[in-house]
Regions:
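Single conserved hydrophobic/aromatic residue that forms the stacking wall/gate
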Residues: 2-9, 13
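A conserved pocket-lining segment of Rossmann-fold NAD(P)-dependent short-chain dehydrogenase/reductase
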Residues: 24-47, 67, 75-85
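Mid/C-terminal beta-alpha module of Rossmann-like enzyme folds, strongest
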Residues: 51, 58-142
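A short glycine-rich, His/Asp/Glu-containing loop-to-beta-strand
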Residues: 135-176
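Short beta-strand His + acidic residue motifs that chelate non-heme Fe in jelly-roll/DSBH
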Residues: 151, 175-177, 195-197, 217-220, ...
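Glycine- and acidic-residue-biased ligand/ion/polar-headgroup-sensing regions
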Residues: 181-200
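Short acidic-glycine-tyrosine-enriched beta hairpin
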Residues: 200-222
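Double-stranded beta-helix
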Residues: 201-204, 229-261
């Protein structure tokens, strides 16, 4: 009853090109090396090392899970002869490779993959990163620079928009536009600035003075033209900007109109 039968163990310690397809794929894709997949439809049942360790800790506490086996199939049974880990993941070789290519493209696409809590993707991403060569742990971001400062997209998400960082030079005003559906949040993290909003068709201007000394978030409301002004004569204004959608040049939903006429 103290024997634990382990499934294919996926973790950061397996040897690539030796005893694990997952380790081999992670290593080769992380290092831009070729891989070979003879049959993408082949399904593996994988057990992540942390889940195995958690189950072993449960066993030490007398809280192990018991089972019997019918061939290779686990049959949970309270008085079973074997201990087993109930958390495993059935996934095809094609699915594994597809996810790994998404992970590898992230520095180019900025797209954060969907990695729900307790998902196989979350475990695979951590495993993939453990094979990343040290020179790939840092990568450049595309800075859009002009005389006013810079704007740099940091991350994209599939369903929750994007995060960027905006740097404004002293005295500079940026924005002066509004959106129908798109909305944003501006968070000044360094410097001293003024964020202004005005609802289209009205004259009232909302003024929000913000500073890196007190981190606050200001929502750019749909239908409100808005700007951000660096009030300093000497310091740059650094603002983290969240937008609920990724910018689409074919459907920008951006209309220019000064806040103060």
């Amino acid at each position: 009853r103290d024997v634990e039968r382990s499934r294919g163990l996926g973790d950061v310690y397996k040897r690539q090109n030796y005893n694990s397809a997952v380790a081999t794929f992670c290593n080769n894709i992380a290092n831009d090396l070729p891989i070979q997949v003879n049959d993408p439809s082949v399904e593996l049942e994988l057990l992540y090392i942390d889940d195995l360790v958690d189950e072993m800790i449960h066993a030490l506490k007398g809280e192990e899970h018991h089972c019997e086996f019918e061939g290779l199939d686990v049959q949970p049974k309270a008085d079973g002869r074997y201990c087993y880990c109930p958390v495993t993941h059935k996934v095809t070789l094609g699915e594994i490779v597809g996810l790994l290519h998404q992970f590898a493209e992230m520095p180019k696409t900025l797209m954060i993959p969907e990695i729900p809590a307790d998902s196989f993707a979350k475990r695979l991403y951590s495993t993939f990163l453990s094979y990343l060569p040290k020179e790939k742990a840092i990568f450049d971001l595309k800075m859009n620079v002009d005389q006013r400062g810079s704007f740099t997209e940091l991350v994209h998400t599939l369903n929750c928009g994007q995060v960027s960082i905006n740097i404004s030079k002293p005295g500079v005003t940026k924005g002066e536009h509004w959106h129908n559906t798109k909305w944003e949040q501006f968070i000044v993290v360094s410097g001293h600035g003024l964020i202004q909003l005005r609802k289209e068709g009205t004259d009232e201007v909302l003024n929000y003075e913000v500073s890196g000394e007190k981190i606050q978030s200001v929502i750019m409301l749909p239908g409100y033209t808005h700007n951000i002004i660096n009030l300093s004569d000497t310091e740059e204004l650094v603002t983290v900007m969240y937008c609920n959608e990724i910018f689409n040049p074919n459907k920008p939903d951006t209309y220019f109109d000064k806040v103060e006429k």
